[in-house]
Amino acid sequence: MAKELKELTPRSVNYSQWYQDLVIKADLAENSAVRGCMVIKPYGYAIWEKMQRILDDMFKETGHVNAYFPLLIPKSFLSKEAEHVEGFAKECAVVTHYRLKTNHDGTGVVVDPAAKLEEELIIRPTSETIIWNTYRNWIQSYRDLPILCNQWANVMRWEMRTRLFLRTAEFLWQEGHTAHATREEAEIEAKKMQDVYANFAENYMAMPVIKGVKSESERFAGALDTYTIEAMMQDGKALQAGTSHFLGQNFGKAFDVTFIDKNGKSDYAWATSWGVSTRLIGALIMSHSDDNGLVLPPHLAPIQVVIVPIYRSAEQLTQISEKVAGIVAKLKALGISVKYDDADNKKPGWKFAEYELKGVPVRLAMGGRDLENNTIEVMRRDTLEKETITCDGIEEYVKNLLEEIQANIFKKAYDHREANIINVDTYEEFKEKIEDGVFIMAHWDGTPETEELIKNETKATIRCIPLAGDKTPGKCMVTGKPSACRVLFARAY
């Protein structure tokens, strides 16, 4: 039964199916009765809650406060920022009526045609418009600035091809929206939040990222600059893990958000927006997990340590439970989340397989012989290595082991990326190498036409213009025209 529990399609056979199998079998999420919308199950939601708590603390440490704005946005609001609405128009879900009525033949309910709204309402795909309409009421003077708001919410984008966590019609996210008195302040804010996201990705998700700026055609709709963090998944595809947008005065002008500056002159407010979503759970899975199941970094694992008793009698279980109670108390005192699984409806082998599948970083097992010898078996999920150690000082041992696992998971992902990022100088070589599932650094002439040609012919996109690294100019691999620096190309989720 334990083998059946873990039967996953191997990554080498079908990476996409492996991912789908794992999300379902590890009890993270499932499809719902609504097309493109998922049910996030308790274990998956526990990971999101940990992400939320950590990010929320990071936002508050950088001066942000939480607020909540309406789910429904008047259609006219979206019409005020042309670029913005064009970017989201095809994905918008529209509310046209406000009432149902019982069908005359008694077969159920129908939309009441008399309840048609005068103006349709859009279920938010993102909240810039409703928030900037509100900011107009909050801002009169430079003394009212900056406004640094974050919102935890759900949004809807009517995606046609959906995949659990990675791309769903409805998803959970946070969206920050800030207003500033100067361009410089807003640009600093946008870059700062990119740094916050990179810090979270690398130090909590154990996922190395490349920080960069999006090309003009890949920017957020209505942004002057989009700062991104890009991660490599195990199949070599890129995943955009977070974005921060410098919006200039576009929304200030669209919603007439003006203020009197220090010199007594009227000006439009400067804007940023930034967000990450439940997509990060998909990134977490694809960055670290293996053919045995999830591999979760300890900093985000809902259960960091599980303890399984192995016993032959009720009396022996009682003795093991008494011994384990002291270990549990010591681990919890160090802030470690621990579960003691003494349920009698599953055998130890089943439990081992289940917690391996669920990616619990450390598994402890205690049997009768361990009880006699004051020992305990320790298994680490990242390497599947086992050893038997003394119970004396077990809490410090486990604490250090969790940090070692966190560092090792990051190093493994970092080494994988570094081994699969290459420089390419010719378009022929580019077309050949992109099939290998790699990140490619290549010269581009800066035109959207060349970018589009590469995308159409190879399915690779410019993920970003990296902020760090080699800035040596060169010649575009396609046109031979001058190129300011190499940019990052990859196929992407």
Swiss-Prot record:
SMART domains per UniProt: ProRS-C_1
Function: Catalyzes the attachment of proline to tRNA(Pro) in a two-step reaction: proline is first activated by ATP to form Pro-AMP and then transferred to the acceptor end of tRNA(Pro).
Pfam families: HGTP_anticodon, ProRS-C_1, tRNA-synt_2b
Enzyme class name: ligase
GO biological process: prolyl-tRNA aminoacylation
Domain notes: Consists of three domains: the N-terminal catalytic domain, the anticodon-binding domain and the C-terminal extension.
Name assigned to this protein: Proline--tRNA ligase
EC number in record: 6.1.1.15
Source superkingdom: Bacteria
